[in-house]
Amino acid sequence: VLVDGAHAPGSIAVDLAAIGADWYAANLHKWAHAPRSCGILWSRPEHQATLHHPVVSWGSGRGFHAEFEHHATCDPTSYLAAPEGMALLREWDYNAVLAYMHSLAMEAGRVLTDQWKTTLDIPKDMRGAMITVPLPEDAGATTGDATRLRLSLLVDEGIEVQLHAWRGRLWARVSAQVYNDRSDIVR
């Protein structure tokens, strides 16, 4: 079982043993305060021999860590900065930060669904610091509609939001980070 935990680290508590994954991959750039291009790839020890880096390099065939440690020519800055981002999370009351971000994301969902007259139907166990909110049906229904609206919001309003088409309507992916507050929602 491969778990794509893209936005989990720093957004929700992650317990790899409880998940029961054979492999786990995730980003660290959004919620764990690491630079872009930094992420993690974890494998159960018994599966590490089956996982190989796509770039053949000096470590090829020398084991899991050697194959993934150095590959081609790359800038290691993001890897070196990642521990600092994780240390920042440890300095804060991590549970309080998660509760704040989750609460603010749900508040954003309530504000938007009230304004758009749509409904937010997310089970409590699937709520996090990022939620997906349905736009009104007349906002569009296609990927092209999503692209046009996203660019219009960015250029005309200075708002960056991920929009996508699904099930015949547009949806907005809204994130609440520790540095956001309610004024960012109503802006």
Language-model region placement:
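Catalytic PLP-binding core of fold-type I/II PLP enzymes
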Residues: 1-22
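Structural signature of PLP-dependent enzymes
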Residues: 66-110
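Structural detector of well-ordered beta-strand residues that form the stable sheet scaffold
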Residues: 2-4, 25, 52, 121, ...
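Active-site PLP attachment segment
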Residues: 19-59
